[in-house]
Design a protein with these regions (language model features):
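Short, low-complexity N-terminal intrinsically disordered segments enriched in polar/charged residues
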Residues: 1-20, 24-28
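A short gly/proline-enriched turn/hairpin at secondary-structure junctions
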Residues: 31-40
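A beta-strand edge to alpha-helix "cap/lid" segment located at domain peripheries
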Residues: 2, 15, 33, 47-117
């Protein structure tokens, strides 16, 4: 499976709230960073963050563009998700995936809230 296909499976896991599908795409020592927001290491910490109780139901994640070069995939996309406080997350993202042996070893994500509503 190409690295792009792994990212597509990872995103599909979020759209279905399928933790097993998401975690299967990751190395055991995965690093997830959103600069200025958080830095996590390991599948257990990753799983806790995707179980974030501020949100309700599955998000809707749409990929706009995937670019692959060597062991790196860049994903540009849009995410919407209902929040428990009644709000809506509506944001654009750019995620940088580093791969090792066909799995995501590091994810650096940048998120910008959509103000054009």
């Amino acid at each position: 499976m190409s690295n792009k296909k792994v990212v597509e499976a990872y995103i599909d896991g979020f759209n279905k709230s399928d933790h097993a599908e998401i975690l299967a795409c990751l190395t055991d020592n995965v690093i997830w960073e959103m600069p200025g927001l958080f830095y996590l290491e390991g599948k257990e910490e990753f799983d806790k963050e995707i179980e974030n109780d501020a949100f309700v139901g599955s998000p809707i994640v749409t990929i706009i563009r995937l670019v692959e070069e060597g062991d790196i995939v860049v994903a540009e996309g849009h995410v919407k998700s209902k929040m428990k406080n009644g709000g809506l997350l509506d944001a654009m993202f750019c995620d940088l995936f580093h791969f090792e042996n066909g799995k995501i070893k590091q994810l650096t994500g940048y998120l910008m809230h959509n103000k054009q509503q």
